[in-house]
Swiss-Prot record:
It comes from Sus scrofa (Pig). Its main location: membrane. InterPro entries: Cadherin-domain_protein (IPR050971), Cadherin-like_dom (IPR002126), Cadherin-like_sf (IPR015919), Cadherin_CS (IPR020894), Cadherin_Y-type_LIR (IPR000233), Catenin-bd_sf (IPR027397), Desmosomal_cadherin (IPR009122). PROSITE patterns: CADHERIN_1, CADHERIN_2. SMART domains: CA (SM00112). Residues 24-49 form a propeptide. SUPFAM superfamilies: Cadherin-like. GO terms for biological process: cell-cell adhesion; homophilic cell adhesion via plasma membrane adhesion molecules. GO terms for cellular component: cytoplasm; desmosome; nucleus; plasma membrane. Residues 50-158, 159-270, 271-385, 386-496 form the Cadherin domain. Keywords: Calcium, Cell adhesion, Cell junction, Cell membrane, Cleavage on pair of basic residues, Cytoplasm, Glycoprotein, Membrane, Metal-binding, Nucleus, Repeat, Signal, Transmembrane, Transmembrane helix. Residues 568-1045 are cytoplasmic. This is Desmoglein-1. The keyword Transmembrane applies.
Amino acid sequence: MNWPFFRTAAVLFIFLVVLEVNSEFRIQVRDYNTKNGTIKWHSIRRQKREWIKFAAACREGEDNSKRNPIAKIHSDCAANQQVTYRISGVGIDQPPYGIFVINQKTGEINITSIVDREVTPFFIIYCRALNAQGQDLERPLELRVRVLDINDNPPVFSMSTFLGQIEENSNANTLVMRLNATDADEPNNLNSKIAFKIIRQEPSDSPMFIINRYTGEIRTMNNFLDREQYSQYSLAVRGSDRDGGADGMSAECECSIKILDVNDNIPYMELPSNSLQIEENSLNSNLLQIRVIDLDEEFSANWLAVIFFISGNEGGWFDIEMNERTNVGTLKIVKPLDYEEVKNLQLSLGVRNKAEFHQSIMSQYKLTATAISVTVLNVIEGSVFRPGSKTYVVTSSMGQNYKLGEFIATDLDTGLPSTTVRYVMGNNPTDLLAIDSKTGIITLRNKVTREQYNLLGKKYQGTILSIDDALQRTCTGTINIDLEGSGWEDRQTDGAVTGGGTITSTNDFTPSYEYTTTNTEDVYSVTPTGNGVRVRHPLDNVHFGPAGIGLLIMGFLVLGLVPFLLMYCDCGGAPGGGAGFEPVPECSDGAIHSWAVEGAQPERADLTTICVPQVPPDNANIIECIDNSGVYTNEYCGREMQELGGGERTTGFELIDGGKISGAPEICQEHSGTLRRNSMRECREGGLNMNFMESYFCQKAYAYADEDEGRPSNDCLLIYDIEGEGSPAGSVGCCSFIGEDLDDSFLDTLGPKFKKLADISLGKETEPYPDPDPSWPPQSTDPICPPQGTEPIGSGHPPISPHIGTTTVISESTYPSGPGVHHPMPIPDPLSYGNVTMTESYTTSGILKPSVHVHDNRQASNVVVTERVVGPISGANLHGMLEMPDLRDGSNVIVTERVIAPNSSLPTTLTIPDPRESSNVVVTERVIRPTSGIVGNLSMHPDISNTHNVIVTERVVSGSGITGISGGSGMGSSGLVGSTAGVGGDGLGLSSLGGGGLSSGIGGTATIGHLRGSSEHHFSNTLGSASPTTTRSRITKYSTVQYTK
């Protein structure tokens, strides 16, 4: 036994025990009992220099200062030296600061503020014991302070609205969605334990969903979800902490659940049965509309239907096309039906969806058939070639009129050869074949020559037309001929042909070919153009010689001289005395026509529709050119098939370079193929029958003549003075106000021929015309201007006394411009008719008030316009019809136009209102009445006393006479009273009165002598005879009145 080892171990053990006993560190913990308010201190000893863990806890959200000091630390080294205690960590010298403090001498740790567990769930305090030199006497100690949790946070859902979806007819307890909610309180604590609950469901017929209380999973309660009933559900879910306790906090969220569609509805057709009638050999793309009804979601694969044939369509005659936007099927005929084969059909249709049926109804699906009865109607079909083509072999030994065979059409209705058709050749290259129009026997027109053999390229393909005149139908058959063997003879001609010729036959239905020949010894090249037809061309032996090169160079040199010649060309000028370009006069657009004949533009006639008369055939076997009635329409399968037959005839002439040379047969080649009914043929002759043309245009002329006789005759006076459109309403008015707006200076440059007209238009003095009637006393044209203070006297009128200023009276004479003077004619009654119809306001009975438009602008210009006042024939009275409003402000304008009265009394005066302010203008135009006296037909109101008053009366027409124009007294300065064109029963009076001022009334007019007539027949036409709304008058400058038709 090793006793020294045991002795050493025992000594060391005793030393450690002594050391531990002498270095003891105590910790006292204060325990505060909140129930009874007592405080207890517990001493904890740390052995082997290890700190005892700090077990004190603080409650969040409360004031824990009443529990201070919450802990106390002590070091055994404080027995023999001074010890300083310090702490550090979160809540002390790290955020949040200052929550814990320590007494450096006693080691007591105090809490100073309220703590939040969600911010800091616990605190770690590092404790140190230091000597006077600041050195650690003990190893740092970690104290943990736990924060007790309270329920101060509600649950929070991760989304405000949760979205989910599930198929309809799903099994019960199928997971729909899972809700997610959190609580910020202490995990695994009752404060953070959330319980879920469904509090509301929309629609709320019956509960369809359940939720797991702890996990938040939403599942189906049953398998009764039906999208066709409800396509969406809305749930309200509440989450409460403390496991759903009454003292817990809660939150709510929304859940939207979409029900997905499955193919759980069997489609069906709207009509269970139907019946149809169709014609044989017809096609129809819209025979029947079949609507499918499906309750699944529209435009989805579960809704889209497919209609199929169960039976009855074994021949593939019908097809069904579905419209995916409407789910409607269209029954179509894609193959013609033959009445002789099928007379009735029973179609059985079924329907299904594009998507497979859902497993919930898979066992319930049963195919339901929809019956459609189809009746085929018989039509007259005509004849066809069966088979459609035949092939023959032709050798060089076969001569003219050799019978190749027969090609007979078959009547589809009877199945026998047709006996009501005639046969003609359609496409017949090189005029090789001929066919008998009755029997359909095909023969060779002539023996095949070497030229034909080379041109056809050993292969002939032509067409034969079978024309049924009774049914107006045409069918086409194809002829194929193989040219075999050798020993083909050359073409025989009556004489040698010098030079070359070209025969070309080209149309829209046959392959083109070209044959060129110079003599019988030339070498040809043959080029195929398709469809077995070849083109022969002579070998190229033309060369570009020196003469041609020289001519080409000469041409370029001449072109180089053109710019120099243009430099010396007078382009419009006349430096050498030439006339130059003649300017085109204005208004010459109608003198240049785009057609070559005078008169109106000729009508464009479609000459292609003119039928050329045909020559009747002399030989039945030789088919002439068929006319337009030889082609008929075939209508099969709903499409219009129209074909034109072919035929030839020999004219004995050949058309070469615009001339005809005898000795060469001409082929009148027909266009063959598909054309429209009654389409015209085109022959290479290019001419038309002139007899037919003459007949055509004669019928056209008679048609125009008949049309002119049927039109209403215009042998009466037109409404307007010009042809064309009527004049706008109100275009003829008082033109005396627009004279200064017209610029007539351009009349000075017209030349001597228009000098006289220019002088008349400008109002200059002209030499009087010689008076052929010496009994007509001439009158002076000089104006009568009495001096100031004198009284100008008019015959039969009272004198005019000047009161203020100067009065000037100007009289103008008007002489007729014709070669002679006509006798004066009486003025007819302008209102000889009963009721008067105007284009503007009119009436047939009673008193018509004229429409007066008053623009009452305060302190502005006032305008009153009354136009075309018309009264009836019975007892009308114009008294009060011209009542004008009281225009109180300045610048008043009153216009009365075309006052027309019937055969009744016209009031002696036309009352003018009281325009009391300055600048008043009163205009009365065209006062017309029947044969009765008009005494003082215009009376001035005495109260027009202000300045700048203008009163104008124009064209006062009466049947018996005009007494005069009287003006009221008391006019101020600058007044003007004018009477223009006063027309009486004996003549025409023109006067113009003016002056600087009139102080007394004007009681008369200056009248032009005895004007008995004019060349223009002033009143030869009854006013209103052509149109009651038209006044045939025209006003020129200086009150000159001219009446025209």
